[in-house]
Design a protein with these regions (language model features):
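Conserved C-terminal structural/oligomerization subdomain of aldehyde/semialdehyde dehydrogenase
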Residues: 39, 46-166
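ALDH superfamily catalytic-core signature
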Residues: 1-57, 85, 119, 164-166
Length: 166
């Protein structure tokens, strides 16, 4: 990554303080900072693009959501271990799989417990795509034809012959 790369600010100073605290606690619990990890020295709620590695299950970063430019890197031995790691989460909004083997990417995507999965692209949305997560990342869908069903009350009406009751 180009060290001159910058990002937009976080939504608020409070969001930046929370994110910096998460990184500090992760490092105190054994995570390594590959790059970044701090505030950008300028006016506003800007944080350096950050990569954390060496995160073990007891680390708070293993269970928390990071809302900002922080990527968590994990080492796994195989596809099954990667899927198990991804699914061992209290959250499930979206995820991405990057691979040259598209069939494998689709297979992995179908096994990961999230509301949205993308193969060879970062998560994103359009009005035509259903948006929503599972677990602690939400319930139901917004947008698309799936989203409109969240606003529809469905009713079952079952009719039997009156003679069948006698």
């Amino acid at each position: 990554m180009d060290k001159a790369t910058t990002l937009a600010p976080l939504s608020s100073e409070a969001a930046l303080v929370k994110l910096l605290d998460q990184v500090t606690r992760a490092v105190a619990s054994g995570a390594s900072v590959v790059m970044g990890g701090g505030r950008v020295d300028r006016l506003g709620a800007f944080m350096q693009p950050t990569i954390l590695a060496d995160i073990k299950p007891g680390n708070p970063a293993f269970r928390e959501e990071f809302f900002g430019p922080v990527a968590l890197f994990f080492r796994v031995k195989n596809e099954d271990e990667a899927v198990a790691l991804a699914n061992d989460s209290d959250f499930g909004l979206g995820g991405s799989v990057f691979t040259q083997d598209v069939a494998r990417g689709k297979r992995v995507a179908s096994r990961v417990d999230t509301g949205m999965m993308f193969v060879n692209q970062a998560t994103w949305t359009l009005p035509e795509l259903p948006f929503g997560g599972i677990k602690n990342s939400g319930y139901g869908r917004e947008l698309s034809s799936m989203g409109i069903h969240e606003f529809v009350n469905k009713k079952l009406v079952r009719v039997a012959s009156i003679d069948a009751l006698m």
